[in-house]
Amino acid sequence: MSQSLHFSPNLTFAKQPFPKLPLPFPTSNSRYPVNNYKSLSIKASTSPSSSSDPQVLVADNGTGNSGVLYNNNNKSVTVSDPSSIEVDAVTETELKENGFRSTRRTKLVCTIGPATCGFEELEALAVGGMNVARINMCHGTREWHKSVIERVRRLNEEKGFAVAIMMDTEGSEIHMGDLGGASSAKAEDGEIWTFSVRAYDSPRPERTINVNYDGFAEDVKVGDELLVDGGMVRFEVIEKIGPDVKCRCTDPGLLLPRANLTFWRDGSLVRERNAMLPTISSKDWLDIDFGIAEGVDFIAISFVKSAEVINHLKSYIAARSRDSDIAVIAKIESIDSLKNLEEIIRASDGAMVARGDLGAQIPLEQVPSAQQNIVQVCRQLNKPVIVASQLLESMIEYPTPTRAEVADVSEAVRQRADALMLSGESAMGQYPEKALAVLRSVSVRIEKWWREEKHHEAMELPAIGSTYSDSISEEICNSAAKMANNLGVDALFVYTKDGHMASLLSRCRPDCPIFAFTTTTSVRRRLNLQWGLIPFRLSFADDMESNLNKTFSLLKARGMIKSGDLVIAVSDMLQSIQVMNVP
């Protein structure tokens, strides 16, 4: 049996707070036997045609014949029979083997490169827990990236995965060239290297690096410190000869193609020239057109300086693809991004804490606090956030991470970030599968510790609903998540067409996993980036009783749930909360 509360957005309380609804549930953590109750559905309306008394419909749970439920126009809802359900193969296996409480909540993003671009390598990553495959437009050709996208799509279709695709733009910042085709170059201490804007037709001289910015030689000064890839390698400018800049290596390291360059003078970052460059370059616009044509799920924009850039890009995507569900991710990796953080997050569909480049623009000791602040703002504004850059950097060359790296990953999980991202570790590292396994095992262990220790953080989640209907959805999800923790339920079910209510539940970070049922494949893949969500594709109707009965039947047949499991269900079609045991 089930107990439910239904709300209608037609209710109006002129400048009154939301009415406090008494909930007939205990607040202890013991499981609550709801079998003795019948389903209660309430609808109230202030429209002239309705009576002054609310309509109450009562029906037994599990019969599939709960009478007529009404939508906002007081018309009966047409019920359709879902014939199948799509779920990620790895999640299905985890649920069968380990149960609800052992499913991983933190999502994993893998950058695809030469080490992982083959179909078998991609499948190994998907089996290992990859939720999102990232393609970095700084490297490779569009034809190469197209082949990767095709393999990921084939993987989803043939093997039963739901891996989303994120395209990361290059951005307009100053960076190195492609190293003449070499995959990397080693800069040793004391070596003299030349950074030049020349275009070499013949093989370039030894220890010479191209720079993409024509004014580079004019802007740098002798004595400036040049940082490669956020400080992974450092040089001191010792001489300027026309378009060439001679530099001495002061901190040795590995040089990678198209690595970002920043230069410092008298202990401060030289920002003026970068500030004049556009956030989205002409190449980026061509890459964005490519991403739209290929139907990627996310586009990550580098070096975002303001919300205006995000809004412009969203309008551009909408004009080029009116039915597109592409989400825009803002990469927070500059001082300007931090200054305008809240407006950027509000405008975007999510954010990435790009710690490598961010650490080249602010003092290193400020990066941890900046990360925590970005994660917190994203959580408050209900936007997924990815912690990226150098999570397991040593595993590019070694099979085991450093203990400091494990602690760093643990902290990101403890901060309740939505996702963790591998960069070079999976793109060009020698142990991509092992690196992913480390992220997965650390995430599961820290999440389990958090639940065992009852760390229900007291983060204030501000109201974000822009309409009255959105505010009701928000209150429902907040209440459902709190009830789930208090009652110790096994899972939260959410039926959502656009994914909004699923994201609201994810924002609350409940103890139990969230089963998100949606009718659209693209929405399902997008939800795969958000904390705690297990996205399913399922055809459903507006009749919650029918949806639940058929969902129970389909999931029980696959061994993913069993009779007696306690579930709370919400829906963005009929704004409601239902609590029930699986029949």
Curated annotation (Swiss-Prot):
<feature type="binding site">
    <location>
        <position position="333"/>
    </location>
    <ligand>
        <name>Mg(2+)</name>
    </ligand>
</feature>
<keyword id="KW-0809">Transit peptide</keyword>
<dbReference type="Pfam" id="PF00224">
    <property type="entry name" value="PK"/>
</dbReference>
<feature type="binding site">
    <location>
        <position position="389"/>
    </location>
    <ligand>
        <name>substrate</name>
    </ligand>
</feature>
<comment type="subunit">
    <text>Oligomer of alpha and beta subunits.</text>
</comment>
<feature type="binding site">
    <location>
        <position position="168"/>
    </location>
    <ligand>
        <name>K(+)</name>
    </ligand>
</feature>
<dbReference type="InterPro" id="IPR001697">
    <property type="entry name" value="Pyr_Knase"/>
</dbReference>
<feature type="transit peptide" description="Chloroplast">
    <location>
        <begin position="1"/>
        <end position="74"/>
    </location>
</feature>
<dbReference type="Pfam" id="PF02887">
    <property type="entry name" value="PK_C"/>
</dbReference>
<comment type="pathway">
    <text>Carbohydrate degradation; glycolysis; pyruvate from D-glyceraldehyde 3-phosphate: step 5/5.</text>
</comment>
<comment type="similarity">
    <text>Belongs to the pyruvate kinase family.</text>
</comment>
<dbReference type="InterPro" id="IPR015813">
    <property type="entry name" value="Pyrv/PenolPyrv_kinase-like_dom"/>
</dbReference>
<feature type="compositionally biased region" description="Low complexity">
    <location>
        <begin position="43"/>
        <end position="52"/>
    </location>
</feature>
<keyword id="KW-0460">Magnesium</keyword>
<keyword id="KW-0547">Nucleotide-binding</keyword>
<feature type="binding site">
    <location>
        <begin position="136"/>
        <end position="139"/>
    </location>
    <ligand>
        <name>ATP</name>
    </ligand>
</feature>
<keyword id="KW-0067">ATP-binding</keyword>
<dbReference type="GO" id="GO:0005524">
    <property type="term" value="F:ATP binding"/>
</dbReference>
<keyword id="KW-0808">Transferase</keyword>
<dbReference type="GO" id="GO:0016301">
    <property type="term" value="F:kinase activity"/>
</dbReference>
<dbReference type="InterPro" id="IPR011037">
    <property type="entry name" value="Pyrv_Knase-like_insert_dom_sf"/>
</dbReference>
<feature type="binding site">
    <location>
        <position position="356"/>
    </location>
    <ligand>
        <name>substrate</name>
    </ligand>
</feature>
<dbReference type="InterPro" id="IPR018209">
    <property type="entry name" value="Pyrv_Knase_AS"/>
</dbReference>
<keyword id="KW-0934">Plastid</keyword>
<feature type="binding site">
    <location>
        <position position="134"/>
    </location>
    <ligand>
        <name>substrate</name>
    </ligand>
</feature>
<dbReference type="InterPro" id="IPR015793">
    <property type="entry name" value="Pyrv_Knase_brl"/>
</dbReference>
<keyword id="KW-0324">Glycolysis</keyword>
<feature type="region of interest" description="Disordered">
    <location>
        <begin position="43"/>
        <end position="75"/>
    </location>
</feature>
<feature type="binding site">
    <location>
        <position position="169"/>
    </location>
    <ligand>
        <name>K(+)</name>
    </ligand>
</feature>
<feature type="binding site">
    <location>
        <position position="357"/>
    </location>
    <ligand>
        <name>Mg(2+)</name>
    </ligand>
</feature>
<dbReference type="GO" id="GO:0004743">
    <property type="term" value="F:pyruvate kinase activity"/>
</dbReference>
<protein>
    <recommendedName>
        <fullName>Pyruvate kinase isozyme A, chloroplastic</fullName>
        <ecNumber>2.7.1.40</ecNumber>
    </recommendedName>
</protein>
<dbReference type="GO" id="GO:0009507">
    <property type="term" value="C:chloroplast"/>
</dbReference>
<dbReference type="InterPro" id="IPR015806">
    <property type="entry name" value="Pyrv_Knase_insert_dom_sf"/>
</dbReference>
<feature type="binding site">
    <location>
        <position position="136"/>
    </location>
    <ligand>
        <name>K(+)</name>
    </ligand>
</feature>
<dbReference type="GO" id="GO:0030955">
    <property type="term" value="F:potassium ion binding"/>
</dbReference>
<dbReference type="InterPro" id="IPR015795">
    <property type="entry name" value="Pyrv_Knase_C"/>
</dbReference>
<keyword id="KW-0418">Kinase</keyword>
<keyword id="KW-0670">Pyruvate</keyword>
<dbReference type="GO" id="GO:0000287">
    <property type="term" value="F:magnesium ion binding"/>
</dbReference>
<keyword id="KW-0630">Potassium</keyword>
<keyword id="KW-0479">Metal-binding</keyword>
